[in-house]
């Protein structure tokens, strides 16, 4: 989640140029918190004293739960941890026959201009919400929802109207926290205002660009899962081209995302070559900042301190897609995971961070962040060696302690070594301030790509 911060405008801002060869940085010390060793005795005591929550059996035919390969107990737990329905069938209902629809194929469309326009502040011609086929993290059929915002007026620039893919940091566990919910239903307690703090949508619309905003956590609200997010974004681009072939079929697309939106953007560019190779000539670049590119770093920087609530929510979000993670929860964590907390937005689950609890308190195994399973998840979500087929602009706060800059620098090094034209900017600030200090240049860089200016390469 990005905090409240000041945006200084839509133009180039002074960034601190990174030298071509960045020295190997050390992981900065995390903020002060409770430094506890593994807690096997407390874990054992929790499971002895607290019974497991009573759970109804999972429906065998539920694609949301996908219980076929799970034990009955784990299937029941997974079913109980899924996000609550929000009373909007467009969002809640799993479409029939998804296996027969190609990724990016449209399954439903609705016009939400009447409710969306007041929330967008700037004038718009139309806002469409697309429901389309995508794949989950295991390449099984799923569905995605994306909102396409079309500006007023004709496009007067060269070629077709460009599209900005604005990957917001949704950072949430409930479906009503998605940007599509606010656009379809108006402002609510669940609305995420990050899109106004970093006003990419508004600036792009005033520029004459269309804007695509994806609910990139998927129907399971798999917060922090980059493969789900990457697939959802790539298939959203396919869906737009399928829905409006005459207006946007030959358009260029450019991506931008910060923090949780950078997780999604990173997933999209790293998976593009293998999942949607035809988009390599359609997407002209991606700008990403505050990049949680390596979760093994966050295991040190966000555990047992004020960020622990967000970190626990991210682990839980990944567990929704990877139930082997859910199987490592102790009884206390299971009670929390099946409670109303499992469908909340970030302003709720950040609060437990004041307790500065280590993740060990929720696990049923010692050293859960150094387990074989943890290292497997780190490797899968890091997507080592996958090359972006499009140019990259990467930035990170040099004083960052929640999401250490070493992760972004390593991503930059990796992509440079793979031959990707890339730029890295080390900007002033920790996570919240750096969102503002790095934003103007990243948006200017993306604008230049959409205008057809060749991407610089500072590798």
Residue ranges and their predicted role:
Residues 37-101, 289-387:
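Accessory cap/linker subdomain of secreted extracellular hydrolases
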Residues 375-378, 393, 402-459:
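C-terminal catalytic histidine-bearing segment of alpha/beta-hydrolase fold enzymes
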Residues 18-144, 150-155:
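Catalytic-loop region of hydrolases
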Residues 388, 393-400:
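Short beta-strand/loop motif that positions the catalytic acidic residue
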Residues 136-203, 215-217:
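Short, surface-exposed "cap/lid" segments of acyl-processing enzymes
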